[in-house]
Design a protein with these regions (language model features):
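Conserved catalytic network of the ASCE P-loop NTPase/AAA+ motor domain
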Residues: 3, 48-53, 71-76, 124-126
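Conserved phosphate-donor/acceptor-positioning beta-strand/loop module used by diverse small-molecule
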Residues: 56-62, 73-98
Length: 153
């Protein structure tokens, strides 16, 4: 995507490198999104950056990522901070971000919105064991609530 640099936020590798990491048991979680532009693959690698024996880590991911992280690290090691936004507001924000792109891809925005409705369904939230939700209506209030709860851990 425009503006992304290798090693800043993401690391980009080819299929062969990904398969080698899988064979070596280094892939913590992976998923593929069938986008308008073709499949996009994302994964998290155990490269030593996440050291739960001595540090805490914050990762941003989907329910699928959360479930895979629990399987890899153990359920007692992973605490969900489920942030939700009302559908209309989420769509408004996504549309505003897309309009800022040099070449907005509204078809992909719509695909992602519909996919998210399935990926974050009430059924999947329940299956993941998510008990607490943070509503991101007022950003500052949402952040204060999250910070308060994180301090408990």
């Amino acid at each position: 995507r425009k503006g992304e640099e290798n090693g800043v936020g993401y690391y980009f590798v080819d299929q062969a490198a990904y398969e080698k990491m899988c064979q070596n048991g280094k892939v913590i979680e992976s998923r593929t999104y069938e986008t308008i532009n073709g499949p996009w693959h994302y994964f998290t690698v155990d490269d030593g950056q996440i050291r739960l024996d001595r540090d805490n880590a914050i990762l941003i991911g989907t329910l699928e990522v959360y479930n895979q992280m629990k399987r890899y690290f153990g359920e007692e090691q992973v605490v969900p901070l489920y942030i939700e936004v009302e559908d209309g507001l989420r769509l408004e924000r996504a549309l505003a971000r897309e309009r800022m792109q040099d070449v907005p891809n509204y078809a992909e925005l719509c695909r992602r919105y519909l996919a998210d409705r399935q990926d974050f369904s009430e059924e999947k939230i329940a299956e993941a064991g998510i008990l607490k939700r943070y509503e991101n209506i007022d950003f500052d209030a949402c952040c204060r609530e999250i910070v308060r709860d994180v301090k408990i851990f």
